[in-house]
Amino acid sequence: MFVSTYEGAIDAKGRVSIPAPFRAALGGSSRVFVWQAPDGSGALEGGGEELMELYRETLAELPLQSPIREAIVTCIIAASAELKIDDTGRVKLPEDLCEAGELSGKIKFSGQMDSFRIWNPERFSLHQMRMRSIVTAPETLDAFASAYNRVRQRRMAAGRGGEGS
């Protein structure tokens, strides 16, 4: 799982070091997929083969001619760059993705559980402020608490415990 936030940098050749915990979350794979996040945040999103397989299975659930399926295929699958992780944990980000994310010099990596994001630090700060205003809203806390309780009840019913056990 991709968790936490890390600082990084892009060198003159467009290479970035993927944080060691993120490389571990990739399961030792030497490949990573990166695309422009489709939510308009300006971030790049990345993940491994497991995430792409999950997307493939999810897309197979949608009708072949579905506009939603086509949009996801176009904006994520077709727009993904498949990158090789070198022996030092670096990848070379394509220039078009660096431009789309306004990435140069310092960058931020943020874990998104199943995926991770690569951010321009200023964009990341703005995003954090927006997300903090959303997460503190009573309706957000209520929705999360309800979902949490449903998951916890399912886990307990399955004999897996309630609090992260």
Swiss-Prot record:
GO terms for cellular component: cytoplasm; nucleoid. GO terms for molecular function: DNA-binding transcription factor activity; transcription cis-regulatory region binding. GO terms for biological process: negative regulation of DNA-templated transcription initiation. CDD domains: MraZ_C, MraZ_N. It is found in: Cytoplasm, Nucleoid. The keyword Repeat applies. InterPro entries: MraZ, MraZ_C, MraZ_dom, MraZ_N, MraZ_sf, SpoVT-AbrB_dom, SpoVT-AbrB_sf. It comes from Hyphomonas neptunium (strain ATCC 15444). The keyword Repeat applies. Its main location: cytoplasm. This is Transcriptional regulator MraZ. Belongs to the MraZ family. Residues 5-51, 80-123 form the SpoVT-AbrB domain. SUPFAM superfamilies: AbrB/MazE/MraZ-like. Forms oligomers. Keywords: Cytoplasm, DNA-binding, Repeat, Transcription, Transcription regulation.
